[in-house]
Amino acid sequence: MAVGKEILTKIRSVQNTQKITKAMQMVSTSKMRKTQERMRLARPYAEKVRMVMSHLAQTNTDHGIPLLESHREIRRVGFILITSDKGLCGGLNANVLKKFLAQVQEYRNQGIEEEIVCLGSKGLMACQSIGLNVVASAVNLGDTPKMEMLLGPLTELFQRYEKHEIDRIHLVYSGFVNTMRQEPRMEVLLPIGENVIGDSAPKSPFSWEYRYEPTALAVLEYLVRRYLESVVYQALSDNMASEQAARMVAMKAATDNAGNAIKELRLVYNKSRQAAITTELSEIVAGAAAV
């Protein structure tokens, strides 16, 4: 019964793996719900800032703020690449990286260089492994990242845009559609215009005239920064919800596959045990007949 013992050992091993994947599935389900709740709570603030920025964009006023400049010749682009810090989430990171690398290659074909800020260790490791120009990063963000953790890398990129060292900034992340579907997204974060504000922003038939205190420049610079930060944080929240959903689905599939493997191994074990019993009975009968 050496074969039977080996099969039993395999069954126990798969059962232990199944317990782990089941636990990870339950943890991911809980984390996904919490992340969705954070997305819901942050949405009113983001929508209000977005609405004001939409009104400002519709005024077509030159406020003298580099972050509000709408037209530039593209010579160098920046990317904010958002990925997860951990794996075991299916093809989530691979799909985002595929979209990101395709855009990088398209720019390189036009002679346009890139500078990258990575939020998440998976994207950082991927960029470093192929020699891309990573200028800043933030990793190990945890389950409840604070905006303060992102300000350093983001400020680095925004300042380079203000100095005209970068002419466009893309935001790349996994968008949460539903539990079963997450899609890679790429948006133009800067310059601020229709690509970020227009289609989904509230439209109004009226013109807006704002009065600024203490000065228009001070208010607008502050508002634009808060707007950009809210867009990035919303994308990060989307990516985290996508990560937990993808991990939950992946772990459920792994748990189900482990269950199927256990059934097949038990069937093989029972067949081998039955064959061994049949052989022993045959030997007993043959021995009795010989006597």
UniProtKB/Swiss-Prot annotation:
The listed locations are: Cell inner membrane
Gene3D superfamilies per record: 3.40.1380.10, ATP synthase, gamma subunit, helix hairpin domain (1.10.287.80)
- Known SUPFAM superfamilies for this protein? ATP synthase (F1-ATPase), gamma subunit
Positions the record marks as coiled coil are none
Q: What is its main location?
A: membrane
Keywords assigned by UniProt, alphabetized: ATP synthesis, Cell inner membrane, Cell membrane, CF(1), Hydrogen ion transport, Ion transport, Membrane, Transport
GO CC, sorted alphabetically, is: plasma membrane; proton-transporting ATP synthase complex
User: Which Cys-Cys disulfides exist here?
Assistant: none
- What GO MF terms are annotated? ATP binding; proton-transporting ATP synthase activity, rotational mechanism
Q: Please give the biological process terms from Gene Ontology that the record holds.
A: proton motive force-driven plasma membrane ATP synthesis
Purpose:
Produces ATP from ADP in the presence of a proton gradient across the membrane. The gamma chain is believed to be important in regulating ATPase activity and the flow of protons through the CF(0) complex.
Task: Give the HAMAP family listed for this entry.
Answer: ATP_synth_gamma_bact
The record's similarity note reads:
Belongs to the ATPase gamma chain family.
Complex formation = F-type ATPases have 2 components, CF(1) - the catalytic core - and CF(0) - the membrane proton channel. CF(1) has five subunits: alpha(3), beta(3), gamma(1), delta(1), epsilon(1). CF(0) has three main subunits: a, b and c.
Tell me which PANTHER family the record gives: ATP SYNTHASE GAMMA CHAIN (PTHR11693), ATP SYNTHASE SUBUNIT GAMMA, MITOCHONDRIAL (PTHR11693:SF22)
**Protein name according to UniProt:** ATP synthase gamma chain
- In the record, what lineage is assigned to the organism producing the protein? Bacteria, Pseudomonadati, Pseudomonadota, Betaproteobacteria, Neisseriales
